[in-house]
């Protein structure tokens, strides 16, 4: 989530230096806001009207303060800026959409669409870009507005869509769709708004572009934000807690909303979630016109960034485009909406904001039509201030004006259409926001140019006859270096800063200082004979275009005044913090060889190249005066370029001697083991400031070795000569560079004074720094007090040093050196042992042979370890040679594979040209693939990376085992610790002050193991002891010399092996890089061949189609020609007939193609028709079955109703019969007693006729009850076979 919202401003439209227009009408068109009318076309106020107080205006104005007239943010438009900008004009696209009428408004329509781009309102015609009638769909609106917007966005243009109109006219529906249209189940519906459709198309097009330009590494990134402007206050809809946000404006980034939330989106679902979240927080309210009226302006912004890079030429581009979707609140009248209270306040703010927008559009339209400059009031409202880039700026604007065709909205419709007409007249300046980067090709050109200059410098450096060439070469080098620095390529990486603020005393090796001064004098004498001539020539040398070098000095002064840099033979120059140096050698090679040979004969140092011996060299335009008192006249060398800008002693030391090591020395000596008497060699070291361990104070150089030396202090005469040399240097340098002369001179004098103070202050002759020509990576040694220590040296070293002292130093220094040599001459190489005057002396006598034995044993062990290491290095070299051979084999295989690819291309070309048949092509291709498979198999089996990994693994295992054996099993660590302890005790004896007087008179012990102890030697044999000790001294010296020579040879062989290994590693890296490049080239070639095959297949198919078409055309032409020949047409008419025949044949072919297309269409339509007929038939059958089922259901329902009715009737009859039966039973019950009484009477009276009477009475009763029995029988018969009971059983 990103809290930043940027709207870039078009700098072309800004004109800060242009004054206000003198036209009074223009100045009056912008009165103070407090007296402004709320109407759009309010007349300008009188010029004499008094302006209100600025304080009250500032209190009521919520916007940021206006910039002063001199501020470049003040924007004015004029015809000159429009013509001078050079950008293509793009007008505003206006689309009018008519809202469908409501039920109460039908039949009362005043807006009528005349054509696709015009409409009439009450007889008045308006013309726009497009007209959407009430029947238009959301998809049609998207095709008119959204589709071009997406394409413009992908092309790199800023695009905006405004929805403008009265309240309830359908703006929100057009922009966002219905209220539930953003849910997932409605995302694919027809009612979707413009915004979801735009982003659906945008993400689809992004995927297409990424697939289409996959080789260009095309990547897109989209981020969105949503805000509303409610009552002139900006609220973040994605984070509603952030209210009243401020609009900021910056010259670089343009207009943006501070602290606005931006979220990255990747698909349509993310955008929909943002819209649902944001639009749910938007202010809406109900009015009498619209139940869901938007009460604020809503701005949805999406920034689309694309990056692509062409791998072939290194060209990369960065495009940025912005989509602004603005849903403006609708204008409304209080009379029609009935707004009151808060709604009335909202309506007032909305109308005021829209009025200011209309005023802004009026001014922009007037500027576009008349070309007169006017002030554009972007700051009148938050809306216009935020969207000023879309209005007359760098954007393509489309405005959707929604109108209602009802008679009741006539005035609002006219106002909207007039607003749209004015907006259509605006001309924006839309440009593609793309940044192209072509650094690779440019740098290739720079490299080519620098190579040419380097070649010219090498060629011209060997030409001593033309001295002017060196000057031009130096200036070309400076110009090239300027070019590199302008692109950041000439700035070397600095070493990490070291904290040197500690209280550490540094010891200066003052002999090295003097030798440095001597060498500076030697080298500066090179140009002593031709200094005046060269200084005069600097002023007269002219470049090829006629300009003198003096005139070009100010241009290149920043390069010329760079600090000096020390170059080595095998390494790049390195720089320390705040020290960037450059070196330009203008010395001929024959002179360099002569000077190096001279230095070899006259100094004790190992022969060094000029790059190692000097800090840097002067250009021939920068001459240095020599010190004739210090330097012989027959010695010549290179000029030295003194680094400027050095203000402190440490920098002075660094600039004076780049190859000197600065060794920190502790306040008290640290007792550590001395180094073996092994002579280190000079190595090509980089110029750097390194702190290392202390070196022995009196260690001296020996036979081509470069060790730390220490000599006597320089004399005042020498310091005076150094002062003269530095003053001469600063004086002559000021002639060429007058800018920094004083600073350079002061720094030199300060450094020389500091050296003099160090030389004269301390009694022990120690200084803060030690100067040494020792390589920075050499082994450290222990620092011991010069007056209290004895050091083993090689015979002859004193003589060499003394010779050097006699050759170059002053008289005082020479005497001092001779005295020191005489003091140490009697015992130059042997170890000093105290006499037997104390218990300490006796202890040291007993420990001397044992200590010497341990030292020799340790040195032998180390020599054996060194031999073993050399053997391992030789085996590694052998393995590396094998690895090189495998790399060469791999490169040869790659070359063969490349050749096979070229042969394949030739075969493909032959196949396309028809020279090679398809079968031959397949056979050759198969053979080539078999050969390539074999090569790849060999490469896989003998891959160098596998062997390299095995070699490294074996080497690591051997090293681990050796370290384990050396320090663990052999006990070398304990032995070394014992040697260190013994040597410390021995050294303590020498440092003891009580033994200093005995050191001068003591005799040396015999260092042979067969010699008798010191206590057993009588005093009478002094002469024989001296002879014996002399012999032992000689033997010891020879043995030590052999060990030193052997160690030197081994070290030389080791360094040679290391150099060979480094060289082979470098070659391996080159071979590996070449292999990778060949692999990449092979991959690219294979991809290119695949694309060529695809294109070839497409071309072959098209070729076959064209051949068939050509044959048909040719046949038609032949037919027409035959017909013309049969008709007897000849001459000019035949040519006309031929042309006509060709045209007719082409038309026939086209008609045949169309006929075939129509035939296919007809077949498809017939198929669809048959399917439709079958579907209709099936639907008819289904309908018939449904109708039959419906009729059966109706009959069954009717029968069920009849059965229910009959059952009800039967139940009623049963009830009646039950009642009747009960009545009859009651009647019979009453008749039975009467019958009994009557029977008794009758028995008494008529006993004779009893049987007949009984028979008649029974028959009478039966007759009376017979109808009842019949009815019961009928009822039972009716109930048993009833269909209703069977129907029930069927239903069950």
Swiss-Prot record:
GO terms for cellular component: chloroplast; microtubule; phragmoplast. Residues 91-426 form the Kinesin motor domain. The keyword ATP-binding applies. Residues 293-297, 326-332, 375-379 are annotated as: Microtubules-binding. ATP binds at residues 165-172. Residues 1-86, 677-724 are annotated as: Disordered. It is found in: Cytoplasm, Cytoskeleton, Phragmoplast. InterPro entries: KIF15/KIN-12, Kinesin_motor_CS, Kinesin_motor_dom, Kinesin_motor_dom_sf, P-loop_NTPase. GO terms for molecular function: ATP binding; microtubule binding; microtubule motor activity. Residues 19-29 have a biased composition (Low complexity). Keywords: ATP-binding, Coiled coil, Cytoplasm, Cytoskeleton, Microtubule, Motor protein, Nucleotide-binding. GO terms for biological process: male meiosis cytokinesis; microgametogenesis; microtubule-based movement; phragmoplast microtubule organization. Residues 424-461 are annotated as: Neck. Plus-end directed kinesin-like motor enzyme that plays a critical role in the organization of phragmoplast microtubules during cytokinesis. Constitutes a signaling module in association with serine/threonine-protein kinase TIO that is required to support phragmoplast expansion and cell-plate growth in plant cells. Binds microtubules in an ATP-sensitive manner. Homodimer and heterodimer with KIN12B. Interacts with TIO. This is Kinesin-like protein KIN-12A.
């Amino acid at each position: 989530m990103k809290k930043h919202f940027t709207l870039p401003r078009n700098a072309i439209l800004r004109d800060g230096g242009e004054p206000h227009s003198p036209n009074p009408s223009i100045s009056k068109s912008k009165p103070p806001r407090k007296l402004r009318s709320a109407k759009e076309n309010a007349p300008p106020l009188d010029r004499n009207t008094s302006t209100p107080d600025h304080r009250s205006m500032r209190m009521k104005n919520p916007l940021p303060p206006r910039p002063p007239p001199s501020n470049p943010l003040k924007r004015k438009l004029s015809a000159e800026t429009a013509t001078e900008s050079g950008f293509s004009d793009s007008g505003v696209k206006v689309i009018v959409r008519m809202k469908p009428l409501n039920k109460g408004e039908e039949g009362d329509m005043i807006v009528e669409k005349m054509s696709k781009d015009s409409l009439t309102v009450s007889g008045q015609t308006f013309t726009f870009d497009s007209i959407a009638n009430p029947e238009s769909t959301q998809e049609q609106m998207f095709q008119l507005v959204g589709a071009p917007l997406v394409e413009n966005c992908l092309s790199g243009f800023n695009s905006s869509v405004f929805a403008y109109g009265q309240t309830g006219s359908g703006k929100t529906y057009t922009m966002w769709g219905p209220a539930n249209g953003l849910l997932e189940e409605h995302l694919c519906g027809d009612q979707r708004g413009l915004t979801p459709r735009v982003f659906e198309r945008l993400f689809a097009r992004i995927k297409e572009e990424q697939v289409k330009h996959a080789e260009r590494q095309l990547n897109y990134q989209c981020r969105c934000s949503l805000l509303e402007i409610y009552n002139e206050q900006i609220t973040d809809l994605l984070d509603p807690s952030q209210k009243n946000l401020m609009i900021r404006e910056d010259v670089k980034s343009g207009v943006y909303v501070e602290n606005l939330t931006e979220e990255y989106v990747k698909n349509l679902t993310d955008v929909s979630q943002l819209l649902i979240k944001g639009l749910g927080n938007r202010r809406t309210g109900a009015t009498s016109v619209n139940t869901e009226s938007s009460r604020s302006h809503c701005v949805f912004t999406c920034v689309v960034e694309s990056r692509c890079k062409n791998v072939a030429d290194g060209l990369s581009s960065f495009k940025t485009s912005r989509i602004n979707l603005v849903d403006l609140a609708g204008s409304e009248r209080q009379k029609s909406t009935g707004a009151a209270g808060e709604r009335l306040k909202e309506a007032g703010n909305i109308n005021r904001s829209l009025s200011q927008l209309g005023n802004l559009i009026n001014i922009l339209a007037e500027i576009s039509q008349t070309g007169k400059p006017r002030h554009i009031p972007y700051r009148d409202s938050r809306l216009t201030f935020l969207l000023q880039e879309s209005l007359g700026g760098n954007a393509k604007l489309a405005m959707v004006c929604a109108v209602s065709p009802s008679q009741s909205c006539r005035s609002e419709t006219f106002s909207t259409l007039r607003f749209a007409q004015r907006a259509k007249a605006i001309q924006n300046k839309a440009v593609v926001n793309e940044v192209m980067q072509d650094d690779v090709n440019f740098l290739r050109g720079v490299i080519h140019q620098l190579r040419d200059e380097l070649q010219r410098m090498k060629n011209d450096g060997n030409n001593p006859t033309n001295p002017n060439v060196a000057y031009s070469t130096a200036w070309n080098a400076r110009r090239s270096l300027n070019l590199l620095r302008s692109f950041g390529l000439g700035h070397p990486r600095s070493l990490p800063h070291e904290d040197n603020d500690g209280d550490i005393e540094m010891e200066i090796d003052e002999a090295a200082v003097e030798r440095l001064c001597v060498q500076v004098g030697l080298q500066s004498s090179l140009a002593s004979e031709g200094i005046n001539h060269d200084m005069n020539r600097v002023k007269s040398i002219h470049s090829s275009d006629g300009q003198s070098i003096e005139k070009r000095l100010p241009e290149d002064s920043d390069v010329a005044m760079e600090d000096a840099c020390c170059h080595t033979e095998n390494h790049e120059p390195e720089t320390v913090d705040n020290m960037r140096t450059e070196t330009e050698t203008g010395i001929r090679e024959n002179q360099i060889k002569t000077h190096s040979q001279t230095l070899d004969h006259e100094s004790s140092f190992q022969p060094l190249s000029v790059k190692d011996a000097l800090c840097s060299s002067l250009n021939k335009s920068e001459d240095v005066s020599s010190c004739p008192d210090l330097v012989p006249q027959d010695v010549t060398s290179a000029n030295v370029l003194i680094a400027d800008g050095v203000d402190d002693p440490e920098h002075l030391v660094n600039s004076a001697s780049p190859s000197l090591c600065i060794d920190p020395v502790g306040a008290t000596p640290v007792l550590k083991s001395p180094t073996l008497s092994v002579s280190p060699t000079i190595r090509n070291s980089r110029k750097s400031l390194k702190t290392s361990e202390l070196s022995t104070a009196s260690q001296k150089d020996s036979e081509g070795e470069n060790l730390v030396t220490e000599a006597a202090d320089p004399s005042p005469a020498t310091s005076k000569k150094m002062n003269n040399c530095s003053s001469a240097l600063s004086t002559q340098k000021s002639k060429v560079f007058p800018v920094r002369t004083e600073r350079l001179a002061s720094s030199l004098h300060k450094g020389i004074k500091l050296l003099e103070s160090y030389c004269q202050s301390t009694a022990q002759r120690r200084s803060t720094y030690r100067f040494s020509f020792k390589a920075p990576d050499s082994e450290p040694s222990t620092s011991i007090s010069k007056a209290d220590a004895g050091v083993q040296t090689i015979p002859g070293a004193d003589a060499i040093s003394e010779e050097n002292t006699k050759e170059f130093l002053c008289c005082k220094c020479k005497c001092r050196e001779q005295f020191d040599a005489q003091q140490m001459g009697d015992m130059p190489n042997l170890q000093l042992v105290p006499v037997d005057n104390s218990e300490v002396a006796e202890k040291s006598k007993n420990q001397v042979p044992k200590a010497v034995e341990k030292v020799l044993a340790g040195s032998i062990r180390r020599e054996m370890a060194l031999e073993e290491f050399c053997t391992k290095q030789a085996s590694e070299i052998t393995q590396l040679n094998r690895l090189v051979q495998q790399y060469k084999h791999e490169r040869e295989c790659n070359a063969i594979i490349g050749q096979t690819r070229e042969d394949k291309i030739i075969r493909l070309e032959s196949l396309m040209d028809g020279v090679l048949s398809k079968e031959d092509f397949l056979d050759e291709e198969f053979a080539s693939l078999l050969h390539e498979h074999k090569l790849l198999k060999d490469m896989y089996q003998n891959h160098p990376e596998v062997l390299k990994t095995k070699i490294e693994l074996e080497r690591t295992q051997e090293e681990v085992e050796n370290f384990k054996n050396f320090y663990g099993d052999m006990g070398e660590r304990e032995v070394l610790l014992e040697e260190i302890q013994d040597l410390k005790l021995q050294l303590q004896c020498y440092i003891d002050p009580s033994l200093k007087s005995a050191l001068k008179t003591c005799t040396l012990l015999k260092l042979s193991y067969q010699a008798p102890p010191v206590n057993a030697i009588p005093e009478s044999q002094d002469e024989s002891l001296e002879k014996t000790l002399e012999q032992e001294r000689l033997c010891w010296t020879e043995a030590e010399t052999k060990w030193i020579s052997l160690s030197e040879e081994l070290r030389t062989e080791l360094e040679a092996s290391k150099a060979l290994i480094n060289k082979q590693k470098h070659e391996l890296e080159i071979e590996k890089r070449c292999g990778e490049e060949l692999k990449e080239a092979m991959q690219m070639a294979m991809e290119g061949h695949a694309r060529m095959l695809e294109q070839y297949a497409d071309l072959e198919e098209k070729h076959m189609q064209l051949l068939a078409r050509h044959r048909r055309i040719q046949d038609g032409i032949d037919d027409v020609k035959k017909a013309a020949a049969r008709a007897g047409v000849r001459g000019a008419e035949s040519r006309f007939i031929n042309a006509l025949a060709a045209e007719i044949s082409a038309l026939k072919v086209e008609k045949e193609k169309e006929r075939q297309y129509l035939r296919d269409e007809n077949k498809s339509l017939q198929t669809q028709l048959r399917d439709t007929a079958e579907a209709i038939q099936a639907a008819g059958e289904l309908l018939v079955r449904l109708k039959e089922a419906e009729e059966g259901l109706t009959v069954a329902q009717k029968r069920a109703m009849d059965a229910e009715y009959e059952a009800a009737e039967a139940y009623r009859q049963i009830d009646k019969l039950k009642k009747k039966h009960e009545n009859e039973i009651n009647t019979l019950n009453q008749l039975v007693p009467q019958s009994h009484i009557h029977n008794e009477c009758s028995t008494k009276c008529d006993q004779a006729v009893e049987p007949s009477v009984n028979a008649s009475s029974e028959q009478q009763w039966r007759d009376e009850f017979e109808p009842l029995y019949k009815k019961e029988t009928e009822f039972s018969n009716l109930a048993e076979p009833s269909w209703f009971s069977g129907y029930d059983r069927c239903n069950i």
